[in-house]
Design a protein with these regions (language model features):
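Conserved acid/base catalytic micro-environments in cytosolic active-site loops
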Residues: 1-197
């Protein structure tokens, strides 16, 4: 795997994501992992629609799924998702349970990905009414990766993006089109650098 972008959003971020994922070229290499802080039913319906309009393969991430380039994996907040090494590859460890504290679902996915892939990770936060994702962005930055947020002006709910925007002095002013462009640039820049688990 050469590069992974982890995107976090709340239930108010679907419209933002619809402007980003379809704009990406699967030839850019690497994978996209998305954590949506919404119910699994809503996320599954959204994934079916997004897969139909994208060049990327868009799927619901499952436990044991091997991370593959040119794919977009989407998870709901009812899952605790960690990326882990397995037999020279990276796989998802997904634990679904109503008893899991899902207040840090985005953080968990970002932190586990950054700890494995170091500077080959970008973290992105979109619209959301929750504060999840801030710790994940911090970990990605500390490992040498890149972190971006959607300009709060483009967010229906600004809580998820406004805190990190101030705290980490992140590159602001990015709308969905610019975010898609930055994500592609990160992936293309690392396309030839493959890392194994």
């Amino acid at each position: 795997m050469n590069f992974v972008t982890v995107i976090g959003l709340g239930e108010s971020g679907y419209a933002n994501l619809l402007k980003i994922i379809p704009a990406l070229n699967p030839d850019m290499g690497g994978a996209i992992c998305v954590m949506v802080l919404d119910s699994s039913d809503h996320v599954e319906s959204f994934v079916k629609y997004l897969d139909a309009i994208c060049d990327f393969e868009v799927t619901i991430g499952q436990n044991g799924t091997t991370l593959e380039g040119g794919s977009c994996y989407i998870f709901s907040a009812s899952d605790q998702v960690l990326l882990s090494p397995y037999s020279g590859h990276y796989t998802f460890k997904v634990r679904s349970s109503e008893k899991i504290d899902n207040s840090e679902s985005i953080d968990d996915l970002m932190v586990s990905t950054a700890s494995l892939l170091k500077n080959r990770v970008a973290g992105v936060l979109l619209s959301g009414s929750q504060t999840d994702g801030s710790k994940g962005l911090e970990m990605i930055l500390s490992e040498g990766g890149s972190s971006y947020i959607l300009n709060p002006e483009y967010c229906l709910h600004k809580t998820m993006t406004s805190g990190p925007f101030v705290r980490y002095n992140l590159q602001g002013g990015l709308d969905e089109t610019k975010l898609a462009s930055v994500i592609q640039q990160c992936h293309y820049a690392n396309k030839e650098n493959v890392i194994t688990a």
